[in-house]
Amino acid sequence: MYRLAAFDMDGTLLMRDHKIGSITLNALHQLADAGVTLTFATGRHYLDMKGILSHSGLNGYLITGNGTRVCDAEGNPLYGMDLPAELVEFVLRTPWQTNASIHLFRDDGWFTDRNDPDLLIAHTTSGFHFQLTEWDELPLTGNHKFCFIASHQELVELKAQLEQQMGGEADFCFSATDCLEVLPRGCNKGVALEKLSHHLDLTLADCMAFGDAMNDKEMLSRVGRGLVMGNALPQLKQELPQLQIIGRCEQQGVAHYLHHWLSSPHLTYSPEF
């Protein structure tokens, strides 16, 4: 039986109203009651996640910022990685050929120089919001990650620019089709979950994980059982063909899977099909 379950949030647990569905909440509480450690692994900020979980009655370990931070259930930091100061300065001062908005995440919040209220819709449950700033007002140290937000095609073109200019100094991933992230080199949910597992005297083989986007790839591929959402990005399904595909997020596919798994933990096939 797996001893830890790690869940992505957007596209995996969160419904279109950006809340966890009632059936899924029930399944997660049952999982915790069965002695499985809950872990929420997300690109969202720690402050955002605490707001979401406070409305759900759930508690668990947090992997936030796509692996840049790991905290215990009380919010105590266990692990963290930041972007190098010189890379932050380079990204902020380079005139990239793009219309994408740029967002920088630090322990004290989410910062941007562009006011786009539509971006706050996904954070209505938690009340988390961006802080408008001039880039030269922020320290170059203590920065977790960058996010660029635009159409997918524009971000594909921007990613090519970033990779050409920065080479192997950072990692890049699409956490959604319209969100390109720049992360510290070697930082991802899989590495963060490995650090957490070691802290808990577990191995990745003791873990199951659920996800839908490319920022879930390393986590899903390294755990004892990785489950891909039915609504996952096509690229994720293509790159992890060996993993089971379960139901869609809007159908609360995680709950459906967990209800079957809790009654038959040694099930070797996905009950979705």
Swiss-Prot record:
Listed EC numbers: 3.6.1.-
Residue numbers annotated as active site: D8
Residue sites binding Mg(2+) per the record: D8, D10, D212
A Pfam family this chain is assigned to: Hydrolase_3
Entry keyword set: Hydrolase, Magnesium, Metal-binding
Protein purpose: Catalyzes the hydrolysis of 4-amino-2-methyl-5-hydroxymethylpyrimidine pyrophosphate (HMP-PP) to 4-amino-2-methyl-5-hydroxymethylpyrimidine phosphate (HMP-P).
Family: Belongs to the HAD-like hydrolase superfamily. Cof family.
PANTHER family, sorted: HMP-PP PHOSPHATASE, PTHR47267
Protein's recorded name: HMP-PP phosphatase
Originating species: Yersinia pestis
Lineage: Bacteria, Pseudomonadati, Pseudomonadota, Gammaproteobacteria, Enterobacterales
